[in-house]
Amino acid sequence: MAASLLPSIFVPLVGLVFPAVAMASLFLYIEKEQVS
């Protein structure tokens, strides 16, 4: 049961969290480059 339930939680988590972290890190990198 847990094996079939895990992808339904893991896939949206990766699909939402990973792009958010990538966009945040890219935004901070651009801001840091503009300031300096």
Curated annotation (Swiss-Prot):
Location(s) in or outside the cell: Plastid, Chloroplast thylakoid membrane
- Identify the GO cellular component terms for this protein: chloroplast thylakoid membrane; photosystem I
Q: Does the keyword S-adenosyl-L-methionine apply?
A: no
| Keywords, ordered alphabetically | Chloroplast, Membrane, Photosynthesis, Photosystem I, Plastid, Thylakoid, Transmembrane, Transmembrane helix
Q: Where are the transmembrane segments?
A: 9-29
Q: How does it sit in the membrane?
A: Single-pass membrane protein
> Where is it mainly found?
plastid
**Which cysteines bridge via disulfide bonds?**
none
GO biological process terms held by the UniProt record: photosynthesis
Answer whether the UniProt record assigns the keyword Nucleotide-binding to this protein: no
InterPro entries, alphabetized: PSI_PsaI, PSI_PsaI_sf
- Function of this protein? May help in the organization of the PsaL subunit.
| Family recorded in the similarity comment | Belongs to the PsaI family.
Protein's recorded name: Photosystem I reaction center subunit VIII
Q: What is the lineage of its organism?
A: Eukaryota, Viridiplantae, Chlorophyta, Mamiellophyceae, Mamiellales
